[in-house]
UniProtKB/Swiss-Prot annotation:
Its EC number is 7.1.1.-. It comes from Liriodendron tulipifera. GO terms for molecular function: NADH dehydrogenase (ubiquinone) activity; quinone binding. One of its GO terms (cellular component) is chloroplast thylakoid membrane. The keyword Zinc does not apply. The gene is ndhB1. GO terms for biological process: ATP synthesis coupled electron transport; photosynthesis, light reaction. It is found in: Plastid, Chloroplast thylakoid membrane. This is NAD(P)H-quinone oxidoreductase subunit 2 A, chloroplastic.
């Protein structure tokens, strides 16, 4: 009898929850239509996997890619609509949020074809991989549109949990297990620090959780210049710093890059930074509006440390993935310049433009690492010596992406950095921009060193790995080459196409 009553209560509670969710989607579903497409894609993946055999594997890739493309299309159709706040103030849709969501979807769309051959060769579980990628993408999109402190905390946890699982996907690999453990421990600690910072904001604002209402609450309570706000700023900066991985919050990055499967590293290296940058701009610009001098100083210190340490340590690396890990630390220092500049001198527009180019440059480089690693089983920089003699396409595309990362003209990376540094210079960040220019020169050195190795070999000799290198037929690795071609084209956009890109980015103001 007791069991029967409990069962009825469970059914009633479940029905109420379902009806509440249906009501929210019915009246607010249009606000999160791109996210709903991904949710539908996730459900479809689970249904097909549970009812099909190995012959339907291509359908899994097709459904995942189609869901992402349809979500991008839905975002583009919604472009230039009036800003809207939905779900009782928890979620906001505007051009600024949507362009970051577009960047995250673009990353995921490029990463799936990049992963196909790797998954087949390593015999990884395909469905789970695609589910984690789509779920992480969904979490990143919700983080971009988050409008209150609770959603800002929960959304990155959705992204982070999938990231931990993806990082440890090759369970038999000791390095992967070590990387996942470090990633999980650091991620858990940073989440605790972040929520502690939000608790200080919550108390200081009189119990408000929405970003704009926190500002109004701080004015009412006269706490906007209190020590509690400074404490909240420090804790939140440290918490967000883990996601952005600037120095000195970068300790996990090289180990995770080296130990995780290469397609996973490619995915995490761009999506996490895009989502965290979107969140950081809103958090610093709105709740900490009255503490702009303080958070500007904090971010300047992080940017300087990141640009110097990231680029200097990258010179000493022998692993290609570890080198890109430290390179990404330096790159996030450049992005932070745009966050500091803000709206006043097109800082956000320059940051968005540079991140768009960074996605193509970085994913193009990782596509080369995936392709070479599958043929040789190594990612040691010295083992790339003389690759041009065996695979000219791979060597040339790698060279273009690396040169663009270094910021050499007339490639896209040069114009992205130029606009970013110019906006910083106009905002009076002379020292920060000078450090950025100097460290960019340092980065060119280690990129050119790799390119020289690719083209001429070490002492005019090729390594045994390259000597035994066998390029697969086009039909077997066309997915990686497709991603690489798209990324190379995007990395070599001439300066003439910068103006429309910057104009679109300038429409993303709050």
């Amino acid at each position: 009898m007791i069991w029967h009553v409990q069962n009825e209560n469970f059914i009633l509670d479940s029905t109420r929850i379902f009806m509440k969710a249906f009501h929210l989607l019915l009246f607010h579903g249009s606000f999160i239509f791109p996210e709903c497409i991904l949710i539908f894609g996730l459900i479809l993946l689970l249904m097909i996997d549970s009812t099909s055999d190995q012959k339907d594997i291509p359908w899994l890739y097709f459904i995942s890619s189609t869901s992402l493309v349809m979500s991008i299309t839905a975002l583009l159709f919604r472009w230039r609509e009036e800003p809207m706040i939905s779900f009782s103030g928890n979620f906001q849709t505007n051009n600024f949020n949507e362009i970051f969501q577009f960047l995250i979807l673009l990353c995921s769309t490029l990463c799936i074809p990049l992963s196909v051959e790797y998954i087949e060769c390593t015999e990884m579980a395909i469905t789970e991989f695609l589910l984690f990628v789509l779920t992480a993408t969904l979490g990143g999109m919700f983080l971009c549109g988050a409008n209150d402190s609770i959603t800002i905390f929960v959304a990155p946890e959705c992204f982070s949990l999938c990231s931990y699982l993806l990082s440890g996907y090759t369970k038999r690999d000791v390095r992967s297990n070590e990387a996942t453990t470090k990633y999980l421990l650091m991620g858990g600690a940073s989440s605790s620090i972040l929520v502690h910072g939000f608790s200080w904001l919550y108390g200081s604002s009189g119990g408000e959780i929405e970003l704009q209402e926190i500002v109004n609450g701080l004015i009412k309570t006269q706490m906007y210049n209190s020590p509690g706000i400074s404490i909240a700023l420090i804790f939140i900066t440290v918490g967000i710093g883990f996601k952005l991985s600037p120095a000195p919050s970068h300790q996990w990055t090289p180990d995770v890059y080296e130990g995780s499967p290469t397609p996973v590293v490619a995915f995490l290296s761009v999506t996490s930074k895009v989502a965290a940058s979107a969140s950081a701009t809103r958090i610093f610009d709105i709740p900490f509006y009255f503490s702009s001098n303080e958070w500007h100083l904090l971010l300047e210190i992080l940017a300087i440390l990141s640009m110097i340490l990231g680029n200097l340590i990258a010179i000493t690396q022998t692993s290609m993935k570890r080198m890109l890990a430290y390179s990404s630390i330096g790159q996030i220092g450049y992005v932070i310049i745009g966050i500091i500049v803000g709206d006043s001198n097109d800082g956000y527009a320059s940051m968005i433009t540079y991140m768009l180019f960074y996605i193509s440059m970085n994913l193009g480089t990782f596509a080369r690492i995936v392709s070479f690693g599958l043929r040789t089983g190594t990612d040691n920089i010295r083992d790339y010596a003389g690759l041009y003699t065996k695979d000219p396409f791979l060597a040339l595309s790698s060279a273009l992406c690396l040169l663009s990362l270094g910021g050499l003209p007339p490639l896209a990376g040069f114009f992205g950095k130029l606009h970013l540094f110019w906006c910083g210079w106009q905002a009076g960040l002379y020292f920060l921009v000078s450090i950025g220019l100097l460290t960019s020169v340092v980065s060119i050195y280690y990129y050119l060193k790799i390119i020289k190795l690719l083209m001429t070999g070490r002492n005019q000799e090729i390594t045994p790995h390259v000597r035994n290198y066998r390029r697969s037929p086009l039909r077997s690795n066309n997915s990686i080459e497709l991603s690489m071609i798209v990324c190379v084209i995007a990395s070599t956009i001439p300066g003439i196409s910068m103006n429309p890109i910057i104009a679109i980015a300038q429409d993303t103001l709050f």
